[in-house]
Protein backbone atom coordinates (compact mmCIF):
# COMPACT_ATOMS: atom_id res chain seq x y z
CA UNK A 1 0.00 0.00 0.00
CA UNK A 2 1.36 3.46 -0.86
CA UNK A 3 2.51 5.27 2.28
CA UNK A 4 2.95 8.98 2.85
CA UNK A 5 5.92 9.52 0.47
CA UNK A 6 4.27 7.60 -2.36
CA UNK A 7 0.95 9.41 -1.95
CA UNK A 8 2.76 12.75 -1.70
CA UNK A 9 4.63 11.95 -4.93
CA UNK A 10 1.36 11.13 -6.70
CA UNK A 11 -0.35 14.23 -5.30
CA UNK A 12 2.42 16.53 -6.48
CA UNK A 13 2.27 15.03 -9.95
CA UNK A 14 -1.51 15.31 -10.16
CA UNK A 15 -1.61 18.83 -8.74
CA UNK A 16 0.98 20.00 -11.24
CA UNK A 17 -0.90 18.47 -14.18
CA UNK A 18 -4.55 18.94 -13.16
CA UNK A 19 -4.75 22.32 -11.44
CA UNK A 20 -7.20 24.42 -13.47
CA UNK A 21 -8.48 21.45 -15.50
CA UNK A 22 -12.22 20.76 -15.77
CA UNK A 23 -13.78 17.30 -15.74
CA UNK A 24 -15.92 17.05 -18.87
CA UNK A 25 -17.31 13.52 -18.61
CA UNK A 26 -16.78 10.12 -17.01
CA UNK A 27 -16.80 6.53 -18.18
CA UNK A 28 -17.19 4.01 -15.38
CA UNK A 29 -16.17 0.46 -16.27
CA UNK A 30 -16.43 -0.93 -12.76
CA UNK A 31 -18.19 0.82 -9.91
CA UNK A 32 -16.68 -1.06 -6.94
CA UNK A 33 -14.34 1.82 -5.99
CA UNK A 34 -17.28 4.25 -5.65
CA UNK A 35 -18.28 3.95 -2.01
CA UNK A 36 -20.76 6.80 -1.73
CA UNK A 37 -23.89 6.93 -3.88
CA UNK A 38 -24.39 5.19 -7.20
CA UNK A 39 -22.31 5.58 -10.40
CA UNK A 40 -24.85 7.96 -11.90
CA UNK A 41 -24.82 10.40 -8.98
CA UNK A 42 -21.01 10.11 -8.76
CA UNK A 43 -20.69 11.04 -12.43
CA UNK A 44 -23.28 13.81 -12.17
CA UNK A 45 -21.43 15.33 -9.20
CA UNK A 46 -18.06 15.41 -10.98
CA UNK A 47 -19.00 16.51 -14.49
CA UNK A 48 -18.24 20.20 -14.98
CA UNK A 49 -16.13 20.47 -11.81
CA UNK A 50 -12.96 22.55 -12.09
CA UNK A 51 -9.98 21.19 -10.17
CA UNK A 52 -8.65 23.81 -7.79
CA UNK A 53 -5.90 21.69 -6.20
CA UNK A 54 -4.89 18.14 -5.30
CA UNK A 55 -3.59 17.68 -1.77
CA UNK A 56 -2.76 14.90 0.65
CA UNK A 57 -4.02 13.97 4.10
CA UNK A 58 -2.37 10.88 5.59
CA UNK A 59 -2.56 8.28 2.79
CA UNK A 60 -5.57 9.92 1.13
CA UNK A 61 -5.67 12.09 -2.01
CA UNK A 62 -7.95 15.13 -1.78
CA UNK A 63 -9.25 16.70 -4.99
CA UNK A 64 -10.51 20.23 -4.27
CA UNK A 65 -12.99 21.72 -6.74
CA UNK A 66 -14.02 25.31 -7.50
CA UNK A 67 -15.99 26.87 -5.97
CA UNK A 68 -16.81 24.06 -3.52
CA UNK A 69 -16.77 20.30 -3.21
CA UNK A 70 -14.14 17.62 -3.32
CA UNK A 71 -13.26 13.99 -3.97
CA UNK A 72 -11.39 11.74 -1.53
CA UNK A 73 -9.37 8.84 -2.93
CA UNK A 74 -7.69 6.02 -1.02
CA UNK A 75 -5.49 4.00 -3.38
CA UNK A 76 -4.98 1.13 -0.94
CA UNK A 77 -3.00 -1.76 -2.49
CA UNK A 78 -3.00 -1.27 -6.27
CA UNK A 79 -4.96 1.87 -7.14
CA UNK A 80 -3.21 4.38 -9.39
CA UNK A 81 -3.79 7.39 -11.64
CA UNK A 82 -2.26 7.97 -15.06
CA UNK A 83 -2.68 10.76 -17.61
CA UNK A 84 -2.74 10.24 -21.35
CA UNK A 85 -3.21 12.37 -24.44
CA UNK A 86 -4.72 9.53 -26.47
CA UNK A 87 -7.87 7.49 -26.02
CA UNK A 88 -7.40 3.77 -26.59
CA UNK A 89 -9.59 0.79 -25.59
CA UNK A 90 -9.55 0.47 -21.78
CA UNK A 91 -7.00 -1.86 -20.25
CA UNK A 92 -8.15 -4.80 -18.10
CA UNK A 93 -7.66 -2.96 -14.81
CA UNK A 94 -8.89 0.50 -15.80
CA UNK A 95 -11.95 1.29 -13.67
CA UNK A 96 -12.85 4.94 -14.33
CA UNK A 97 -12.00 7.43 -17.08
CA UNK A 98 -12.14 11.14 -16.28
CA UNK A 99 -12.29 12.98 -19.61
CA UNK A 100 -10.83 16.48 -19.23
CA UNK A 101 -11.87 19.51 -21.24
CA UNK A 102 -8.30 19.93 -22.46
CA UNK A 103 -8.66 16.62 -24.29
CA UNK A 104 -6.46 14.67 -21.89
CA UNK A 105 -7.70 11.58 -20.09
CA UNK A 106 -7.19 10.85 -16.39
CA UNK A 107 -7.38 7.11 -15.80
CA UNK A 108 -8.02 5.41 -12.47
CA UNK A 109 -6.79 1.80 -12.52
CA UNK A 110 -6.92 -0.78 -9.76
CA UNK A 111 -5.87 -4.41 -10.16
CA UNK A 112 -7.43 -5.63 -6.91
CA UNK A 113 -10.22 -3.06 -6.65
CA UNK A 114 -9.58 -2.27 -2.98
CA UNK A 115 -9.21 1.47 -3.61
CA UNK A 116 -12.07 3.86 -2.86
CA UNK A 117 -13.42 7.13 -4.26
CA UNK A 118 -16.02 9.32 -2.60
CA UNK A 119 -17.38 12.80 -3.32
CA UNK A 120 -18.51 15.48 -0.87
CA UNK A 121 -20.12 18.89 -1.27
CA UNK A 122 -17.62 19.98 1.36
CA UNK A 123 -14.51 18.10 2.46
CA UNK A 124 -15.42 19.16 6.00
CA UNK A 125 -18.07 16.44 5.72
CA UNK A 126 -15.44 13.75 5.20
CA UNK A 127 -15.88 11.72 8.38
CA UNK A 128 -12.64 9.70 8.20
CA UNK A 129 -10.57 12.87 8.58
CA UNK A 130 -11.70 13.13 12.19
CA UNK A 131 -10.14 9.74 12.97
CA UNK A 132 -6.67 10.65 11.70
CA UNK A 133 -3.75 11.61 13.90
CA UNK A 134 -1.37 14.51 13.24
CA UNK A 135 0.76 14.80 10.13
CA UNK A 136 4.44 13.94 10.72
CA UNK A 137 5.54 17.41 9.58
CA UNK A 138 3.10 19.27 11.81
CA UNK A 139 3.88 20.82 15.20
CA UNK A 140 1.27 18.52 16.75
CA UNK A 141 3.64 15.61 16.20
CA UNK A 142 6.20 16.04 18.95
CA UNK A 143 7.93 13.96 21.60
CA UNK A 144 5.82 15.13 24.55
CA UNK A 145 2.44 14.52 22.94
CA UNK A 146 3.70 11.21 21.57
CA UNK A 147 4.88 10.10 25.00
CA UNK A 148 1.46 10.89 26.44
CA UNK A 149 -0.25 8.70 23.84
CA UNK A 150 2.25 5.86 24.18
CA UNK A 151 1.87 5.78 27.96
CA UNK A 152 -1.84 5.10 27.50
CA UNK A 153 -1.18 1.92 25.53
CA UNK A 154 0.19 -1.55 26.25
CA UNK A 155 1.08 -2.14 22.61
CA UNK A 156 4.51 -2.47 21.05
CA UNK A 157 6.04 0.62 19.50
CA UNK A 158 5.86 -0.43 15.84
CA UNK A 159 2.10 -1.18 15.78
CA UNK A 160 1.61 2.17 17.51
CA UNK A 161 3.47 3.99 14.73
CA UNK A 162 1.25 2.22 12.21
CA UNK A 163 -1.89 3.42 13.99
CA UNK A 164 -3.30 6.15 11.73
CA UNK A 165 -5.15 7.61 14.70
CA UNK A 166 -1.83 8.20 16.44
CA UNK A 167 0.24 9.35 13.47
CA UNK A 168 -1.03 9.85 9.92
CA UNK A 169 0.74 8.41 6.91
CA UNK A 170 3.27 5.86 8.16
CA UNK A 171 3.16 2.24 7.04
CA UNK A 172 5.35 -0.82 7.41
CA UNK A 173 8.21 0.43 5.22
CA UNK A 174 8.84 3.75 6.92
CA UNK A 175 8.03 2.63 10.46
CA UNK A 176 10.71 -0.05 10.03
CA UNK A 177 13.24 2.42 8.65
CA UNK A 178 12.58 5.00 11.38
CA UNK A 179 12.91 2.51 14.23
CA UNK A 180 16.13 1.13 12.75
CA UNK A 181 17.69 4.58 12.55
CA UNK A 182 16.64 5.27 16.14
CA UNK A 183 17.99 1.96 17.41
CA UNK A 184 14.61 1.10 18.93
CA UNK A 185 13.48 -2.53 18.93
CA UNK A 186 10.08 -2.62 17.16
CA UNK A 187 8.86 -5.19 19.71
CA UNK A 188 9.56 -2.87 22.64
CA UNK A 189 6.51 -1.60 24.51
CA UNK A 190 5.68 1.93 23.45
CA UNK A 191 5.29 3.14 27.02
CA UNK A 192 8.89 2.03 27.75
CA UNK A 193 10.40 4.37 25.15
CA UNK A 194 12.06 7.35 26.86
CA UNK A 195 11.44 11.00 26.04
CA UNK A 196 14.94 11.49 24.59
CA UNK A 197 14.39 8.48 22.32
CA UNK A 198 11.04 9.89 21.22
CA UNK A 199 12.70 13.19 20.33
CA UNK A 200 15.04 11.27 18.05
CA UNK A 201 12.11 9.28 16.68
CA UNK A 202 10.28 12.47 15.71
CA UNK A 203 13.38 13.84 13.99
CA UNK A 204 14.13 10.58 12.17
CA UNK A 205 10.52 10.21 11.05
CA UNK A 206 10.68 13.57 9.32
CA UNK A 207 14.13 12.86 7.94
CA UNK A 208 13.22 9.47 6.47
CA UNK A 209 9.98 10.76 4.96
CA UNK A 210 11.71 13.78 3.42
CA UNK A 211 14.41 11.56 1.91
CA UNK A 212 11.78 9.22 0.49
CA UNK A 213 9.76 12.09 -0.99
CA UNK A 214 12.92 13.46 -2.63
CA UNK A 215 13.42 10.02 -4.21
CA UNK A 216 9.76 9.91 -5.37
CA UNK A 217 8.82 7.11 -2.98
CA UNK A 218 9.54 3.40 -2.79
CA UNK A 219 8.68 1.06 -5.68
CA UNK A 220 8.88 -2.54 -4.49
CA UNK A 221 5.83 -3.98 -6.23
CA UNK A 222 2.97 -1.89 -7.61
CA UNK A 223 3.77 1.76 -6.91
CA UNK A 224 4.20 3.98 -9.95
CA UNK A 225 4.17 7.75 -10.32
CA UNK A 226 1.59 9.54 -12.47
CA UNK A 227 4.10 9.44 -15.35
CA UNK A 228 4.40 5.63 -14.84
CA UNK A 229 8.00 5.92 -13.62
CA UNK A 230 9.10 4.13 -10.45
CA UNK A 231 10.31 5.68 -7.24
CA UNK A 232 13.94 5.29 -6.17
CA UNK A 233 13.95 5.05 -2.37
CA UNK A 234 13.94 1.24 -2.49
CA UNK A 235 17.62 1.60 -3.37
CA UNK A 236 18.28 3.38 -0.06
CA UNK A 237 16.36 1.18 2.39
CA UNK A 238 18.49 0.14 5.37
CA UNK A 239 16.34 -2.60 6.89
CA UNK A 240 12.97 -3.12 5.18
CA UNK A 241 12.98 -6.33 3.06
CA UNK A 242 16.71 -6.80 3.74
CA UNK A 243 16.41 -10.00 5.74
CA UNK A 244 19.48 -12.17 5.17
CA UNK A 245 21.50 -9.24 3.82
CA UNK A 246 24.39 -7.55 5.69
CA UNK A 247 23.44 -4.70 8.02
CA UNK A 248 24.56 -1.33 6.65
CA UNK A 249 26.02 -0.46 10.06
CA UNK A 250 27.61 -3.66 11.36
CA UNK A 251 27.79 -5.96 8.30
CA UNK A 252 26.12 -8.66 10.43
CA UNK A 253 23.37 -10.36 8.44
CA UNK A 254 19.90 -9.13 9.30
Residue spans for each PLM region:
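Basic, nucleic-acid-binding surfaces and adjacent catalytic neighborhoods in DNA/RNA-processing proteins
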Residues: 22-42, 55, 60, 147-252
